[in-house]
Regions:
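Structural signature of tandem-repeat unit edges
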Residues: 1-77, 81-133, 138-158, 163-180, ...
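Conserved hydrophobic site in ankyrin repeats
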Residues: 552-553, 583
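Boundary/linker segments of alpha-helical solenoid repeat arrays
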Residues: 561-568, 594-596
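Charge-dense, extended regions
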Residues: 578-599
C-alpha cells in the first residue's frame, strides 16, 4: 500500500466507495484525501468521492474507461498510468471539466492535468485549454496535437508537462520537437534553429527550453521573441527574418528584449524594409538607425544616417558612440538606460534631442552639445550621471526635467534660450549663469512644494554682472510673489540689496539664505533674522561637523555672548580647535569683522 509514512495503521480509513473499489485515506482532517486504492478487474467506471492524492502511486487500472468526479472533490493528483485507458471524465462539480481529459477549472482558467495514455493513432485536442500541468502527457504515445490556441506563452506550461512522453522522445525535425504549436524541445547542437512561425502561425515554447544553449535562433514574427522564457536566458544570436510590415519600434523591441541580467548579444534583421550592417539595423535607405545589437560596446554611426530612431540603443551595453555630422535628430528614448555609456561625441548638425533620449545613462559624466542644437526634450538627461554639460549659443528650448536628478553643480545658459520649462535643472545645481535675466529661469529652478532635507538647497543665479541667491523650494502661497521679487531685482539696477531669503520654504533654508544675503549684500532684514537664529544655525553646522562654516558665522559678530559660551563647550566636546580659538577671541573682543563666504 502506498500510504504516507507519517500515517499509522490505526489512522487509516478503509472504505468501499462502490462495488469493487476500495479507497484508503487518513482520518486526520488535513490528510483526508485518498492516498491508495484497489480496483477489481473488469470495472470500467469509477466514481471519485474524495480528493485523490496519488502522484507517487505505481499502480495501474487499465480496465477503467470512465471517471466520475463527485461534487465534493477539489484536488486530483495522479499520473496517467493510474488510469491509462480513461477516455471520458464526467464532472459533478465546478472544479473540473467534463470531457476527454482531466481538466481543472479555476474560475474559467482551464489547466490540463491528465490526457491519460493515448495511443499513437489517437489525436489530442487541446481545445480551450489555458495551461498544462506537470506530467500531463506522461506515458502518452500520441504525436497528434491540435487546438490549444488559448495557451498564450511559456508561463502556461509547467517544466515537466511533456516529460516521459512520445512528444519528448520523438526525433528532432529541423532541430525542433513540436506538440501542435508548442515547441517542446530544441537540438542544442545545431548551428542554427529556424522557428516555423509565420504570419498566421503563432509558436509557444515549453518553459524548460534553455535558450542560452542555442547558438543562433531565427524567427519570422516579432511577437515570437516574447515567447522566450527569459528566466532561462537568451540565444547568443537572434535573426528576425520576415516579410511582415513592421514599425521601427517592433524591430528595436525584438533586438532589445532582455532582463536586467541577460540579453541577446547579436541581432540581425532580414526584411523588405530594414537591413542590418555590423549588428545594427537601419531602414532600407540607410537614413535611420533603428536598433543596435545589445552586445556592441563601441559604435561609430556611419555617415549618411540622418535620424537615430526611438529606442535604437535603449538598454544596450554600449560604452561609446560617435555620431556623424549627417545626423540631425536623436529621437525619444534613443539611448535610454544605457548604463555603460560613458562617451558620446555629437556631430555638428544635431538639431534636436528627443524626450528621455539619454535617460538613466548613469555613467555618462560629461557632454558637449554642438551649436546646431535647438531643443532638448523633456527628461532628455533625467537621472544621468552628468557632472558637466556645455550648452552652445543657438539653443532655444530646454524641456521639462531635462537635467533633473543629474550631478551638475554649475551650468551656463546661452543668450539664445527662449524656453525654459518646469524643473529642468537638478537640485544639485549650485550656480546658473545666463547673460540676462529671464523669468522662466525661476520656473526651471524653483519648486512649489516641501523639499526633502537633502534637496533643501540654495542656488546662485548670475545674470550678467549681477547675482543673487534663490531657494530651490518656495511655498505655493508665496512662490509667485518670490519670483516677482527676483525679477524686480534684476530689472532695477539701482536695487542693490535683495530680500529673497524670506521666501524659502523651510526654516533651515531661510537661515542659509539670510546668512548669504547679509554677508554678500548687507541686508538688514537678513541680519535681524540671523541674530534671532544664530545659535540654532551654529549648533546645526556643528552637528554636521561644518567647523569652517561655524567659524564664519561666529566671525559675523551676530552670535550673542551667552550663545558663544555654550558653543565653546560644544566645540570642546567636538574637538573643533579652530572654532574654539575664534570663540575665545570673540569673547575677548567685541569687534568681530565680517568675512565673505559661500554655503
Amino acid at each position: 500500500m502506498g500510504k504516507n509514512s507519517n500515517i499509522s495503521d490505526e489512522d487509516i480509513l478503509k472504505e468501499e466507495t462502490q462495488p469493487g473499489v476500495v479507497v484508503y485515506r487518513s482520518n486526520v482532517p488535513e490528510g483526508a484525501g485518498v492516498f491508495d486504492m484497489d480496483i477489481a478487474p473488469g470495472i470500467k467506471e469509477v466514481t471519485i468521492k474524495y480528493d485523490l492524492l496519488m502522484l507517487g502511486c505505481e499502480k495501474s487500472f487499465p480496465d477503467v474507461e470512465k471517471l466520475i468526479i463527485g461534487e465534493d472533490v477539489v484536488s486530483i493528483e495522479i499520473l496517467n498510468t493510474l488510469f491509462p485507458n480513461v477516455r471520458w471524465v464526467l464532472s459533478m462539480n465546478y472544479e473540473f471539466e467534463t470531457g476527454s481529459y482531466l481538466v481543472y477549472n479555476h474560475f474559467g482558467f482551464k489547466t490540463l492535468l491528465n490526457v491519460f495514455c493515448r495511443g499513437a493513432d489517437e489525436t489530442i485536442d487541446l481545445g480551450d485549454i489555458d495551461s498544462i500541468d506537470n506530467f500531463a502527457f506522461k506515458g502518452c504515445e500520441s504525436l497528434n496535437i491540435i487546438g490549444g490556441e488559448d495557451i498564450k506563452d511559456w508561463q502556461a506550461i509547467e517544466q515537466d508537462a511533456f516529460s516521459e512522453s512520445a512528444l519528448k522522445s520523438q526525433p528532432f525535425q529541423n532541430g525542433i520537437k513540436k506538440a501542435g504549436h508548442i515547441i517542446v524541445d530544441i537540438d542544442y547542437t545545431a548551428d542554427e534553429i529556424d522557428i516555423p512561425d509565420d504570419r498566421l502561425k503563432k509558436i509557444v515554447f515549453s518553459s524548460d527550453i534553455n535558450f542560452t544553449k542555442i547558438k543562433k535562433l531565427i524567427i519570422h514574427r516579432p511577437e515570437t521573441v516574447e515567447q522566450i522564457n527569459y528566466q532561462c536566458g537568451f540565444p547568443d544570436t537572434l535573426v528576425l527574418n520576415t516579410d511582415l510590415l513592421m514599425h521601427e519600434q517592433d524591430v528595436a523591441g525584438v533586438a532589445h528584449f532582455c532582463t536586467s541580467k541577460t540579453y541577446i548579444k547579436n541581432f540581425s534583421v532580414l526584411s523588405p524594409e530594414f537591413k542590418e550592417i555590423d549588428g545594427i539595423a537601419y531602414t532600407m535607405n540607410g537614413k535611420k538607425l533603428v536598433a543596435c545589437s545589445m552586445g556592441k560596446e563601441h559604435v561609430i554611426i556611419p555617415d549618411g544616417v540622418k535620424t537615430i530612431g526611438k529606442y535604437a540603443f535603449a538598454n544596450c551595453h554600449v560604452k561609446s558612440v560617435i555620431i556623424p555630422d549627417s545626423v540631425t535628430e536623436i529621437s525619444e528614448s534613443a539611448f535610454s538606460s544605457c548604463s555603460n555609456l560613458e562617451t558620446v561625441i555629437f556631430g555638428k548638425n544635431v538639431e534636436s534631442i528627443g524626450d528621455k533620449a539619454f535617460g538613466a545613462c548613469v555613467n555618462l559624466k560629461s557632454v558637449i552639445l554642438p551649436e546646431s542644437i535647438r531643443s532638448i526634450g523633456n527628461y532628455a538627461f533625467f537621472r544621468v550621471g552628468l557632472k558637466s554639460v556645455q550648452l552652445s549659443e543657438g539653443l532655444l528650448k530646454v524641456g521639462i526635467g531635462a537635467f533633473a536628478e543629474t550631478l551638475i553643480k554649475s551650468i551656463e545658459l546661452p543668450a539664445s534660450i527662449t524656453d525654459l520649462t518646469v524643473n529642468c535643472f537638478s537640485d544639485m545645481v549650485e550656480k546658473i549663469t545666463i547673460p540676462s535675466f529671464r523669468k522662466d529661469i525661476c520656473v526651471g529652478c524653483i519648486k512649489g512644494f516641501r523639499p526633502l532635507p537633502s534637496n533643501d538647497t540654495v542656488m546662485k543665479l548670475q545674470c550678467g554682472n549681477r547675482y543673487l541667491y534663490i531657494p530651490r523650494y518656495m511655498k505655493p502661497s508665496t512662490i509667485n510673489e518670490g519670483i516677482d521679487d527676483i525679477e524686480a531685482f534684476f530689472a532695477n539696477p539701482k536695487k542693490k540689496i535683495p530680500g529673497i531669503w524670506s521666501y524659502a520654504y523651510t526654516a533651515t533654508c531661510k537661515q542659509n539664505m539670510a546668512f548669504l544675503e547679509y554677508v554678500d549684500f548687507g541686508s538688514e532684514s537678513a541680519k535681524a533674522y540671523l541674530k534671532k537664529n544664530a545659535k540654532k544655525m551654529a549648533l546645526r553646522f556643528m552637528e554636521y561637523d561644518k567647523e569652517e562654516l561655524t567659524v564664519r558665522l561666529v566671525k559675523t559678530g551676530l552670535v550673542s555672548q551667552m550663545a558663544l559660551k555654550e558653543l565653546l563647550d560644544k566645540a570642546e566636546e567636538k574637538g573643533m580647535s579652530i572654532l574654539k580659538s575664534y570663540i575665545l577671541q570673540c569673547l575677548n573682543d567685541s569687534k568681530n569683522p565680517k568675512q565673505n563666504f559661500y554655503i
